[in-house]
Amino acid sequence: MPTFSHESLEMRRLLTYACRILADNGQNDTVFGHVTYREAGADTFWMKPAAMGLDEVTPDTLIRLDLDGTIVEGELRRHLEFPIHSEIFRARSEITCVVHTHPLYSIAFAATEQPLRAVSHEGAQFTPPDVPRFTRTSDLITSRELGEAVAATLGEATSCYLINHGIVVAATTIEEAVIAAINLERASQVQLLASASSQGFSWTPDEQIPGKRANIFTPRHMRSVWEYYCRRIGPI
């Protein structure tokens, strides 16, 4: 049996929480979707394996890849779409966690021509500016070239929509990435519901967004949200 450092064990435990929290918040899609985690600037990363649901992940099922997709630790298969993660990691050394899932409302919302608005608190986390949309293909991102294109679309943003496919979220902490993925789905859902009204809908004016972000999305509040999600999952 392989041995792991304390730091490696903790990273795998946090990544397991990330996967299960996303599943607990409606982002499971049978065995599809994946999350990765690394130390900032590292040339390897831990990843959820293929053929396993987000809700099924345990610390000992995770695999570690290099940026070329070679498995350097673990025995299970990797996802074909590892280039989403590797190319964002190459492009942005500060990023430690990348989430790619297929949440229902985000897919539906991104298929419209609406820009995301701050219809809800969650929307204010992302816009303005608008959340970018990757439109080159709705197929799987299985090559370095396509991964680079996704990373270019994301740019310096936290999130982007993959049209008719899913979402990508990247952040400097695993907690931030997971919460942002959940909040993007919530923001997409609320705006879809509001836009279905024949009466039109309102959203927070752009000039009020900085104050709203400063009040709602503080590190202390985000830590409390993460801890709540972890309590729902229980010990790992």
PLM regions: where:
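Glycine-rich flexible loops
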Residues: 1-236
